[in-house]
């Protein structure tokens, strides 16, 4: 049973979980607020304004939870870039393949390819016969910033992943469609993530409507436009289903609006369906909406 930790702009969540008979068994969960402005997600600029303060928050949280040693971590989506890269060949050795793909992606990056950290999954072949690979890329200097904080908090980061990718891992049983979309909110941002055969394929990070009475129309239109663009430029197969997650009181309203715009079945993602039955551990909020990334990090395959 492993530990998963989500580092967000407003709080840190830590849980211990594993998978039993296809469902998540949650053993322990606790969270702590993060001072405003302490974490500002960026792919190229420093993310943590005061590492000592964040270290103190995480160390206290880990001690309360009884967490020591290795932990798998979900970071805000804007720390990462998700791109599909096409190539005629790929080195067989995985480390060599990563270096090769970093070089291939050099013109897509707002930082030097020398500093890139990249992981990838195969996404089949395109119409031109070239191999397609979905790559999750981050600036190694930014990841090292988070790693130092975790190590100073007496934790060992086993893996660093994007929030929405970790959420999709937690909800993998619910997202089991050949091609499925997920819109998940994280404060003032929302990520549109498309998965094919259970694997991340494309994403776009969008701004949510402001808090001044916005009804979600602009966000709904941007989701529809983004999907149309993906289908035109990335050979994206039609979606079979679409899920909405974490939009607060507007979640159901946005799901209804997307049903009308996209003309396909849209559901609200209910993470409780991914968990084993039984009592939830003390320290967990009444509803699970905010815990998807921490859960997904905990059950992430090594």
Segments from the language model and where they lie:
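Hydrophobic/aromatic-enriched cytosolic interaction surfaces used to assemble or bind macromolecules
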Residues: 1-302
């Amino acid at each position: 049973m492993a530990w998963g930790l989500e580092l967000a702009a407003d709080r840190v969540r830590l849980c211990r979980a594993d998978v039993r008979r296809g469902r998540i068994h949650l053993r322990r969960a606790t969270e702590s607020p993060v001072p405003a402005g302490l974490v500002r997600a960026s792919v190229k600029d420093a993310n943590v304004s005061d590492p000592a303060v964040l270290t103190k928050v995480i160390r206290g949280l880990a001690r309360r939870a009884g967490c020591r040693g290795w932990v798998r971590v979900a970071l805000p989506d804007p720390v990462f870039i998700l791109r599909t890269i096409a190539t005629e060949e790929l080195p067989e050795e995985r480390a060599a393949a990563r270096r090769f793909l970093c070089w291939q992606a050099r013109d897509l990056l707002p930082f030097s390819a020398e500093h890139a950290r990249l992981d990838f999954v195969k996404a089949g072949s395109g119409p031109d016969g070239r191999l397609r690979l979905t790559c999750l890329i981050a600036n190694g200097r930014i990841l090292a910033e988070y790693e130092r904080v975790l190590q100073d908090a007496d934790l060992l980061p086993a893996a660093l992943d994007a929030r929405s990718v970790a959420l999709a891992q937690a909800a993998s049983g619910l997202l089991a469609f050949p091609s499925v979309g997920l819109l998940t909110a994280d404060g003032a941002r929302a990520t549109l993530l498309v998965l094919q055969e259970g694997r991340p394929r494309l994403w776009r990070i969008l701004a949510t409507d402001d808090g001044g009475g916005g009804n979600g129309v602009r966000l709904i239109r941007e989701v529809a436009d983004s999907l149309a663009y993906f289908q035109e430029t990335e050979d994206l197969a039609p979606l079979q289903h679409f899920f909405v997650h974490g939009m607060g009181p507007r979640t159901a309203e946005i799901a209804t609006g997307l049903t009308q715009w996209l003309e396909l079945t849209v559901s609200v993602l209910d993470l409780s369906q991914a968990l084993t039955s039984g009592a939830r551990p003390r320290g967990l909020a009444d509803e699970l909406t905010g815990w998807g990334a921490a859960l997904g990090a905990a059950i992430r395959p090594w």
